[in-house]
Amino acid sequence: MVTILDRINPDAKRVRHPEKAHRPDTEVLRKPDWIRVKAPTSKGYAETRSIVKEHKLVTVCEEAGCPNIGECWEKKHATFMIMGEICTRACAFCNVATGKPNALDMAEPENIAKAVKEMGLSHVVITSVDRDDLADGGAEHFEKVIWAIRAASPMTTIEILTPDFLKKPGALERVVAAKPDVFNHNMETVPGNYLTVRPGARYFHSVRLLQRVKELDPTMFTKSGIMVGLGEERNEVLQLMDDLRTADVDFLTIGQYLQPTRKHHQVMSFVTPEEFKSYETVAYTKGFLMVASSPLTRSSHHAGDDFARLRAAREKKILLAAE
């Protein structure tokens, strides 16, 4: 049996995933050559880690065990995770700890803004744990973080990756009103997998949330991502693309699911680079402005460069429509 301990405070010996303790161990498949990455050792990585720790911040890069952390942190790119490191959901794929969250850190918005300014970020990604325990799901905290970054670094573009705000009336409207540049909400997987992979969420609620963002602010870029290798069929992925285009989503990311521990959902397959390229081609034909599809693609990987390309793609589309 594997006991998963909290990495944030190892002295506490708190079980990191108590909801998964009863599950039988599953085999962790050997990764193919195309998905292996080097351990992070660069000077830039160390500097980014130092800034994160200095401001007592949490990053999804660390909490989710992202394979791209070495590359991103070397370039001083980081995705900040707000509202603590404990999530109220228990998704079968996720390495973020589950449990009863702590009270919100009221200094967090200012601390993030200081880190963004110190790192000289032209584009920042802010995500969060699910906070079903809060009346607004954390919408006000998102709002405060966006405002603080705008005040400290007016030229920095802001991308948010939000939870679904399920049963939190008015929460989405509040976050959209804060005017992030990109609103990202990940679908994570195809609808047939939701019961086992993402049991606390509702597929069509997430689709509707993305659609509602565009209704509230048609100029705001919307983005969503999925993992493959969870047992989905190709036609299910193509249908998900259609659902997202119906919601007028601009940007789709597709990446390989990697199993954090033996207690998490098993990797059912490693999708080849050629299959990822095929998904990208199909997605563009369906009308997405931007598509990132590769084994190591993650929601915030190359987010700054992708935002510039996304903006250019929209401008090109507008010019073509005017001809």
UniProtKB/Swiss-Prot annotation:
Gene3D superfamilies assigned: Aldolase class I (3.20.20.70)
InterPro entries listed in its UniProt record: Aldolase_TIM, Elp3/MiaA/NifB-like_rSAM, LIAS_N, Lipoyl_synth, rSAM
Binding sites annotated in the UniProt record for [4Fe-4S] cluster 2: 87, 91, 94
Swiss-Prot/TrEMBL cofactor(s): [4Fe-4S] cluster
Pathway: Protein modification; protein lipoylation via endogenous pathway; protein N(6)-(lipoyl)lysine from octanoyl-[acyl-carrier-protein]: step 2/2
Cofactor: binding details: Binds 2 [4Fe-4S] clusters per subunit. One cluster is coordinated with 3 cysteines and an exchangeable S-adenosyl-L-methionine.
Molecular function terms from GO: 4 iron, 4 sulfur cluster binding; lipoate synthase activity; metal ion binding
Keyword Iron: yes
Cellular component terms per the entry's GO annotation: cytoplasm
Enzyme class: transferase
Localization terms from the record: Cytoplasm
NCBIfam families: lipA (TIGR00510), PRK05481.1 (NF004019), PRK12928.1 (NF009544)
Official protein name in the record: Lipoyl synthase
